[in-house]
């Protein structure tokens, strides 16, 4: 088959893998709710944890992480090189954030980004988990904790002597969910008042943080 056609197939497959609306389905199946209307209204696993249940949250987290890794694995299975695999990873994030099934209103791409970076640099997983747990224990703020923990993958890419392309790609993957979360961070800050931003970050009800 023509190589261009294979690339197109890989990219389309990656988008549809990413667009699987696991948080939405979990809300509907396990509690009969639209996850986009409760809690933080985010189509993410943390919102499922707090408003649907622990095990549905675990399931959604696993699916969303798996989407990023699966998109790259499928491209690899189709015989595509690392460059195309990286493009497929970005398509998976695009699918997660803008799913065609939900009028292009999805999540922030955090868990999917974790799956991508874990597939690319599995040696970074223990460091990421350690960073997340430490920050979560200190701040009790999931968004801040895993947002900062993302930076550990960039450090792994750099110290692990990965090529510059992989380092820059890791930076791009990390920045996407961080940028997506900026409006949410501003919302929390505005609700608490400019003088109480710190209190909003460290004391705000957990159900509204993601």
Swiss-Prot record:
The gene is plsY2. It is an enzyme of class 2 (transferase). One of its GO terms (molecular function) is acyl-phosphate glycerol-3-phosphate acyltransferase activity. Catalyzes the transfer of an acyl group from acyl-phosphate (acyl-PO(4)) to glycerol-3-phosphate (G3P) to form lysophosphatidic acid (LPA). This enzyme utilizes acyl-phosphate as fatty acyl donor, but not acyl-CoA or acyl-ACP. The chain crosses the membrane at residues 4-24, 54-74, 82-102, 114-134, 141-161, 163-183. This is Glycerol-3-phosphate acyltransferase 2. Its main location: membrane. It comes from the Bacteria. GO terms for cellular component: plasma membrane. Pathway: Lipid metabolism; phospholipid metabolism. Belongs to the PlsY family. Probably interacts with PlsX. It catalyses: an acyl phosphate + sn-glycerol 3-phosphate = a 1-acyl-sn-glycero-3-phosphate + phosphate. Keywords: Cell membrane, Lipid biosynthesis, Lipid metabolism, Membrane, Phospholipid biosynthesis, Phospholipid metabolism, Transferase, Transmembrane, Transmembrane helix. It is found in: Cell membrane.
